[in-house]
From Swiss-Prot:
<dbReference type="InterPro" id="IPR023023">
    <property type="entry name" value="dNTPase_2"/>
</dbReference>
<keyword id="KW-0378">Hydrolase</keyword>
<dbReference type="Pfam" id="PF13286">
    <property type="entry name" value="HD_assoc"/>
</dbReference>
<dbReference type="InterPro" id="IPR006674">
    <property type="entry name" value="HD_domain"/>
</dbReference>
<feature type="domain" description="HD">
    <location>
        <begin position="75"/>
        <end position="190"/>
    </location>
</feature>
<dbReference type="GO" id="GO:0016793">
    <property type="term" value="F:triphosphoric monoester hydrolase activity"/>
</dbReference>
<dbReference type="InterPro" id="IPR026875">
    <property type="entry name" value="PHydrolase_assoc_dom"/>
</dbReference>
<protein>
    <recommendedName>
        <fullName>Deoxyguanosinetriphosphate triphosphohydrolase-like protein</fullName>
    </recommendedName>
</protein>
<dbReference type="InterPro" id="IPR051094">
    <property type="entry name" value="Diverse_Catalytic_Enzymes"/>
</dbReference>
<comment type="similarity">
    <text>Belongs to the dGTPase family. Type 2 subfamily.</text>
</comment>
<dbReference type="InterPro" id="IPR003607">
    <property type="entry name" value="HD/PDEase_dom"/>
</dbReference>
<dbReference type="Pfam" id="PF01966">
    <property type="entry name" value="HD"/>
</dbReference>
Length: 342
């Protein structure tokens, strides 16, 4: 018997009835022979980790520009924290940890440079709009491996596509594992963005709303502990009641929504970051403008996309894949003179 089959048989014994069993995967767009020692979701996890898009996350901003300090989260650190939170919840619920890990590690592959500023600029540029979750799926299906894509399982792609959205009415993933990643993403970024904001001097601990802190906890570790345990126990209650969905309790969920709103009002859309936001927007807009008018200068992959799907699409794919550093260097290369000739 193959090692993979042993693992799949063990899943039948170990995992919750609502979990996604590896041997019941819907499969991939292109058929492949099963691996001898890894389940299909292990294979997906490994492909994501070894992808170029995953490596570039280390030089993409989460909220604060990386050059401001060594301890601010990058998009890669955020991704790893999401994976950790999601796996903790998933193991407690006896879900498929490998599926959770693959979705979590791949959920932001398509995120643009300069955090959500990049997403907003590309959304204005691309007809039909730009969303990082949709771009993450596109990266996995079409951009990676010079246009061949990673050929991930449909469960992983579904989890990546549906990881966004905060309200209970948002479209959710088709697997419990995907739903767990959706909550883990929010739990991770709300808490680490508070931590980074305090480090940057934008917030003080005393600025956090007292009524929310009394419910969720005063420190980041306390809040994560509260949210993770509430998610686990409330989801178990849902399953026992015949309502198979991942969710927070009303009290914790309402407090969490209020805390997220506080972050939007005071950090993401606050005045402190306004000047830096304008600079990043300017750099992105000028790089986009240049390549829209000179798309023949882009690498072969993106030139081919321009010819097949239009210049807007090809330029969007190229710029969306840029790191903060690469985008800034492109701006300097295009617009800043290296020397002056008399």
């Amino acid at each position: 018997m193959k090692i993979r089959e042993n693992i799949e048989n063990f899943e039948r014994i170990k995992l919750n009835k609502v979990a996604k069993f590896s041997d019941e995967s819907v499969g991939r767009e292109r058929l492949e022979e099963p691996d001898e020692i890894r389940t299909c979701f292990m294979v997906d996890r490994d492909r994501i980790i070894h992808s170029k898009s995953f490596r570039r996350l280390k030089r993409k901003t989460q909220v604060f520009i990386r050059t401001y300090g060594d301890h601010y989260r990058t998009r890669l650190v955020h991704t790893l924290e999401v994976s950790q939170v999601a796996r903790t919840i998933g193991v407690a619920l006896s879900l498929n940890e490998y599926l959770i890990e693959a979705i979590a590690l791949g959920h932001d592959l398509g995120h643009a440079a300069f955090a959500h500023i990049g997403e907003d600029v590309l959304n204005d540029f691309l007809p039909g709009g730009f969303k990082h979750n949709e771009q993450s799926v596109r990266v996995a299906k079409k951009i990676e491996k010079n246009g061949l894509g990673l050929n991930l399982t449909k469960e992983v792609l579904d989890g990546i596509l549906n990881h966004s959205g905060f309200s209970n009415v948002s479209k959710v993933a088709g697997t419990f594992e995907g739903q767990v990643v959706r909550f883990a993403d929010k739990i991770a970024y709300v808490n680490h963005d508070i931590d980074d904001s305090i480090r940057a001097g934008i917030l003080k601990e005393d600025d956090l709303p007292k009524n929310i802190i009394e419910i969720l906890g005063a420190s980041g570790s306390e809040r994560i502990d509260t949210l993770v345990k509430d998610c686990v126990f409330n989801t178990i209650d849902n399953i026992d009641k015949g309502e198979p969905r991942v969710s927070l309790s009303k009290e914790i969920g309402d407090a969490f929504v209020q805390l997220r709103k506080f972050l939007f009002d005071n950090i993401y859309l606050g005045k402190y970051l306004e000047d830096e936001r304008k600079k990043a927007e300017f750099v992105l807009e000028k790089v986009i403008e240049y390549y829209y008018n000179n798309w023949e200068e882009m690498p072969d992959l993106y030139r081919n996309i321009c010819e097949e799907e239009g210049i807007h699409r090809g330029v969007t794919d190229y710029v969306a894949g840029m790191t903060d550093d690469y985008c800034t260097n492109e701006f300097n290369k295009i617009y800043i003179p290296k020397f002056v000739m008399y």
